[in-house]
């Protein structure tokens, strides 16, 4: 296990009598980017909680490198509008952080100008970068990013993906990223894992970023994006259970070599 930062082995979680995660196998190595995708209710948030140690699985194991430093970027942050909180004060909630460290982290993510702004007054894109800066302040070996491009347009997504790649290269940290998009992912992703309570399939995203039509559609940061094709041999009902019906379904796909579901 020494080559991994974190490894999940046959992890299963049951909540309120429902199987939320079943037989999950997942690992992230230093410098590796793993993107977790899946529909709403697929168990992505539960898996992240297990990775962060906030939830103990009912069976299976979650192994972490001893003294692993984790930087977590939440999906969103709700701040009371009446709370007098600047970006600097927010970042200084991280133990040991002073103005110099906060300014350096903000500059690294391209948000240096907002350091003294009220956190309630910055844009959604600026908030994403502030949350990313906060995660970096922990000098992480593993970055866990929960839908970091949520609410950002496609051009903004490409820009943020380029930034995340640069941060990975600079800090040599592993990255576990949750994405709401089932097909458009970061091109530098080493592995895409499609989750719907179990691992439906996994693999490397198709590199289409140099296609002229793709570049025209997504602009100068098109190289940051790639398409992921799913390879399922099964479908799920409305409750997430696997449907073993011999009749063909419009959303059932050919089983690929990378599929983890037997």
Curated annotation (Swiss-Prot):
Pfam families: ABC_tran. It catalyses: Zn(2+)(out) + ATP(in) + H2O(in) = Zn(2+)(in) + ADP(in) + phosphate(in) + H(+)(in). One of its GO terms (cellular component) is plasma membrane. It is a peripheral membrane protein. SUPFAM superfamilies: P-loop containing nucleoside triphosphate hydrolases. The keyword Kinase does not apply. It is found in: Cell inner membrane. CDD domains: ABC_Metallic_Cations (cd03235). GO terms for biological process: response to zinc ion. Its EC number is 7.2.2.20. Residues 6-221 form the ABC transporter domain. GO terms for molecular function: ABC-type zinc transporter activity; ATP binding; ATP hydrolysis activity. ATP binds at residues 38-45. Coiled coil: none annotated. Its main location: membrane. Keywords: ATP-binding, Cell inner membrane, Cell membrane, Ion transport, Membrane, Nucleotide-binding, Translocase, Transport, Zinc, Zinc transport. Part of the ABC transporter complex ZnuABC involved in zinc import. Responsible for energy coupling to the transport system. Belongs to the ABC transporter superfamily. Zinc importer (TC 3.A.1.15.5) family. The complex is composed of two ATP-binding proteins (ZnuC), two transmembrane proteins (ZnuB) and a solute-binding protein (ZnuA). PANTHER family: METAL TRANSPORT SYSTEM ATP-BINDING PROTEIN TM_0124-RELATED, ZINC IMPORT ATP-BINDING PROTEIN ZNUC. This is Zinc import ATP-binding protein ZnuC. It comes from Pseudomonas syringae pv. syringae (strain B728a). The gene is znuC.
């Amino acid at each position: 296990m020494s080559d991994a930062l974190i490894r999940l082995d046959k992890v299963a979680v049951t909540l309120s009598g429902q199987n939320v995660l079943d037989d999950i196998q997942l690992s992230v190595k230093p410098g590796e980017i793993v993107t977790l995708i899946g529909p709403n209710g697929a168990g992505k948030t539960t898996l992240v909680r297990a990775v962060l140690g906030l939830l103990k699985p009912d069976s299976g194991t979650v192994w972490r490198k001893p003294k692993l430093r984790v930087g977590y970027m939440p999906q969103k942050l709700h701040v009371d509008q009446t709370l007098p909180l600047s970006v600097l004060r927010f970042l200084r909630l991280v133990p040991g952080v002073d103005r110099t460290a906060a300014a350096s982290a903000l500059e690294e993510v391209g948000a240096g100008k907002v350091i003294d702004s009220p956190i309630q007054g910055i844009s959604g894109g600026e908030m994403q970068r502030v949350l990313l800066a906060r995660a970096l302040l922990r000098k992480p070996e593993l970055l866990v990013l929960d839908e970091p491009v949520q609410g950002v347009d496609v051009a903004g997504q490409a820009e943020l993906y380029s930034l995340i790649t640069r941060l990975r290269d600079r800090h040599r940290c592993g990255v576990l990223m949750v994405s709401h998009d089932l097909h458009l992912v970061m091109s530098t992703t080493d592995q895409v894992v499609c989750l719907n309570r179990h691992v439906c399939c996994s693999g490397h995203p198709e590199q289409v970023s140099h296609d002229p039509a793709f570049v025209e559609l997504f602009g100068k940061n098109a190289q940051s994006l790639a398409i992921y094709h799913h390879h399922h041999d099964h479908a799920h009902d409305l409750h997430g259970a696997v449907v073993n019906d011999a009749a063909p379904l419009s959303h059932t796909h050919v089983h690929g070599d990378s599929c983890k579901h037997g």
